[in-house]
A protein has these predicted regions:
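Hydrophobic helical membrane-anchoring modules
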Residues: 137-139, 144-171
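Short phosphate-binding loop-to-helix
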Residues: 1-39, 49-53, 57
Length: 171
C-alpha cells in the first residue's frame, strides 16, 4: 500500500469539518516535517474526471493571474433563474419575473464543480478560506464533471466515463 506522512485528526475527519479546515491541518502537518509550499491543490476523491492536465492548467492559471485561488466551475445546464418551489402542494416560481424570458437571454450562472481547489498558501493562511478576494474560475465542460453523492450519481459517472473513454471500457 501507499505510505502516508500523517493521518487527518478526528476534528477534520467528520461530516462538519470544512475543506479549509482540512487544508490548514494538512499544511500544518507538512510544515512540522519541514515541507513548506507556496501553492497547494486539494483534490476531492469524489471527482472521477479530474486529470493531471486540468490540475496543471489550473495551477498555471493561479500563477499567471496572481490569484488567491482557482476553483473549477461548470455552467448550470438550465438557468436557476427559472426555478420553482413547491408550496402547499403547488408549483410557484421562485422569481416570477423570469418565467416568460427565454433561457438563452438569462445571465449564465456557474457552480463549484467540487473537483479541486488550487490555492496561494500565504493568502489562504491569512484569510482561512478557499473563497477569497481574487478567485479565478477554471471553467469545465459538463461532460467532465460529476459529483458522486448518490447511487444515481455513480451510474451517471459510469455512463460519462464510457462516453469519454470509448466503447472498449466496461463499467
Amino acid at each position: 500500500g501507499a505510505k502516508v506522512p500523517f493521518f487527518r485528526s478526528a476534528a477534520t475527519s467528520n461530516d462538519y469539518a470544512t475543506t479549509a479546515d482540512v487544508i490548514a491541518e494538512v499544511l500544518d502537518a507538512y510544515e512540522r516535517i519541514g515541507m513548506c509550499f507556496g501553492t497547494a491543490c486539494c483534490i476531492y476523491p469524489t471527482a472521477p474526471f479530474v486529470t493531471a492536465n486540468a490540475i496543471k492548467t489550473a495551477m498555471m492559471l493561479l500563477e499567471q493571474e496572481q490569484a488567491d485561488s482557482v476553483i473549477p466551475v461548470v455552467k448550470f445546464s438550465f438557468p436557476p433563474q427559472r426555478c420553482v418551489v413547491i408550496k402547499d402542494g403547488r408549483l410557484t416560481p421562485k422569481w416570477p419575473e423570469n418565467m416568460a424570458k427565454r433561457s438563452q437571454d438569462l445571465e449564465p450562472l456557474y457552480h463549484d464543480c467540487g473537483q479541486f481547489y488550487c490555492l496561494n498558501v500565504e493568502r489562504f493562511r491569512k484569510q482561512k478560506a478557499i473563497w477569497m478576494e481574487h478567485v479565478v474560475p477554471f471553467i469545465q465542460d459538463e461532460m467532465n464533471v460529476q459529483d458522486i453523492d448518490t447511487p444515481e450519481d455513480w451510474k451517471i459517472a459510469e455512463m460519462k466515463y464510457k462516453l469519454l473513454r470509448g466503447s472498449e471500457v466496461r463499467v
